């Protein structure tokens, strides 16, 4: 059997996260069911990481093995015929070496967070964005974002249930950009703790909305105290943008 890599996109709104759960709809569950229909046998998939309930992906990476002889283009069409109605799309398929693992071979990951920062919008424009009524300062937000660059202990922005042995993560890029009525936060890191990006976002927004000192964010980061982090930002505005490999 050859190992197949798939680039996939999905709307996480209707799912209880990526990882399979016996009694709840998940992205992994839907893909494995689709593969079983085609392969006629159970297929286990592996991913670059697990997105939480409500979080979307533009280019998630998964791998799997199937025994049937089928051209990749035909496999892609067959999978999309099943998955598209469930808000999941196969973007690309290709063969990879058996030694490749979507999670452990990954070098960096990129996430984005979408903030709707305007009163002039249609109701559906907030579907995959976090609405903030107050006009936000891109300059203030970017000064806080600069604090994230480098290797830090992110205990403050970790979840109690996170089982990672080390809370140190390396952040390579973090920046806010204005795009029309939206403000987009982009962050690239070696990897991320459970709910880390949303916790960071919620804290930065709370500091900006309350007109607190920009230095407050750095103080909170360095405290390594979860109790100092502010309300975690909603999941519906978070996107896994891409995963980087050598």
UniProtKB/Swiss-Prot annotation:
<dbReference type="GO" id="GO:0003723">
    <property type="term" value="F:RNA binding"/>
</dbReference>
<protein>
    <recommendedName>
        <fullName>tRNA pseudouridine synthase A</fullName>
        <ecNumber>5.4.99.12</ecNumber>
    </recommendedName>
</protein>
<comment type="subunit">
    <text>Homodimer.</text>
</comment>
<dbReference type="GO" id="GO:0031119">
    <property type="term" value="P:tRNA pseudouridine synthesis"/>
</dbReference>
<dbReference type="InterPro" id="IPR020103">
    <property type="entry name" value="PsdUridine_synth_cat_dom_sf"/>
</dbReference>
<comment type="similarity">
    <text>Belongs to the tRNA pseudouridine synthase TruA family.</text>
</comment>
<dbReference type="InterPro" id="IPR020094">
    <property type="entry name" value="TruA/RsuA/RluB/E/F_N"/>
</dbReference>
<dbReference type="Pfam" id="PF01416">
    <property type="entry name" value="PseudoU_synth_1"/>
</dbReference>
<feature type="active site" description="Nucleophile">
    <location>
        <position position="52"/>
    </location>
</feature>
<keyword id="KW-0819">tRNA processing</keyword>
<dbReference type="InterPro" id="IPR001406">
    <property type="entry name" value="PsdUridine_synth_TruA"/>
</dbReference>
<dbReference type="GO" id="GO:0160147">
    <property type="term" value="F:tRNA pseudouridine(38-40) synthase activity"/>
</dbReference>
<dbReference type="InterPro" id="IPR020097">
    <property type="entry name" value="PsdUridine_synth_TruA_a/b_dom"/>
</dbReference>
<feature type="binding site">
    <location>
        <position position="111"/>
    </location>
    <ligand>
        <name>substrate</name>
    </ligand>
</feature>
<comment type="function">
    <text>Formation of pseudouridine at positions 38, 39 and 40 in the anticodon stem and loop of transfer RNAs.</text>
</comment>
<dbReference type="InterPro" id="IPR020095">
    <property type="entry name" value="PsdUridine_synth_TruA_C"/>
</dbReference>
<keyword id="KW-0413">Isomerase</keyword>
């Amino acid at each position: 059997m050859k190992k197949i890599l798939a680039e996939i996109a999905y709307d996480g709104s209707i799912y209880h996260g990526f990882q399979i759960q016996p009694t709840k709809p998940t992205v992994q569950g839907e893909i494995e069911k689709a593969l079983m229909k085609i392969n006629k046998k159970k297929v286990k998939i592996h991913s670059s990481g697990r997105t939480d309930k409500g979080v979307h992906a533009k280019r998630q990476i998964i791998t799997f093995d199937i025994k049937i002889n089928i051209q990749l283009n035909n496999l892609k069409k067959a999978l999309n015929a099943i998955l598209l109605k469930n808000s999941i799309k196969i973007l690309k398929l290709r063969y990879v070496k058996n030694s490749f693992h979507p999670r452990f071979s990954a070098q960096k990951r990129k996430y984005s967070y979408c903030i709707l920062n305007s009163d002039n919008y249609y109701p559906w424009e907030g579907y995959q964005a976090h609405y903030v009524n107050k006009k936000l300062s891109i300059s203030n937000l970017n000064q806080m974002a600069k604090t994230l660059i480098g290797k830090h202990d992110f205990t403050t922005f970790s979840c109690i249930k996170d089982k990672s042995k080390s809370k140190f993560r390396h952040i390579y890029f973090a920046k806010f950009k204005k795009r029309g009525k939206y403000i987009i936060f982009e962050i690239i890191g070696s990897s991320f703790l459970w709910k880390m990006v949303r916790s960071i976002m919620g804290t930065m927004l709370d500091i900006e909305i309350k007109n607190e000192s920009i230095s407050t964010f750095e103080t909170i980061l360095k405290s390594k105290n979860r109790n100092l982090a502010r309300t975690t930002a909603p999941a519906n505005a978070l996107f896994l943008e891409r995963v980087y490999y050598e």
